[in-house]
A protein has these predicted regions:
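Short coil-to-beta transition motif at edge beta-strands of beta-rich domains
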Residues: 1-14, 54-73
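Short beta-strand-centered aromatic/proline hotspots
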Residues: 18-26, 68-78
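A short, compositionally biased micro-patch
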Residues: 13-16, 24-26, 36, 65
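Generic alpha-helical hydrophobic packing signal
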Residues: 7-11, 23-25, 30
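Intrinsically disordered, low-complexity, charged/polar segments
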Residues: 39-67, 79-81, 87-111
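Short aromatic-glycine-enriched beta-strand elements
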Residues: 19, 29-33, 80-85
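Short, basic/aromatic beta-hairpin or loop at an interaction surface
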Residues: 29-43
Length: 111
């Protein structure tokens, strides 16, 4: 069984077109994920959810919810949530909590 934490970003392996989902509720046997890009919510059995944790790598480019592009310099994980240390196109460094990643990212092969 996968470990879920409210606020984590996941994708549905069966429905990549939903974009990035966010854990909004965890029950004993189920996990609820909202997919803001489509406005849909799914409830999955925790034991066999077709979900893949989204975890970008150093050097990857990601998009914030406001559309800014950032290059990942490092990442830290605390209590199951990732904060990316990034550099914007002007060379300024900022911290980007995973919850502020663009909801419209669509992944073909999750990292």
């Amino acid at each position: 069984m996968q470990d879920f934490v409210i606020g984590q970003r996941w994708i549905s392996a069966a429905e990549l077109q939903l974009g990035l989902g966010m854990v909004i509720e965890i029950e004993h046997r189920t996990v609820s994920i909202v997919f803001p890009a489509t406005g849909e919510t799914r409830i999955y059995a925790r034991a066999d959810a077709p979900l893949t944790r989204v975890k970008f790598r150093v050097g990857d480019w990601v998009e914030k919810q406001d559309g800014d592009l950032l290059r990942i310099l490092e990442l830290t994980e605390t209590n199951g949530l990732i904060v990316y240390r990034c550099e914007n196109e002007q060379g300024n460094e900022i911290d980007l909590p995973e919850g502020r990643l663009s909801n419209f990212l669509q992944l073909n092969q999750p990292g």
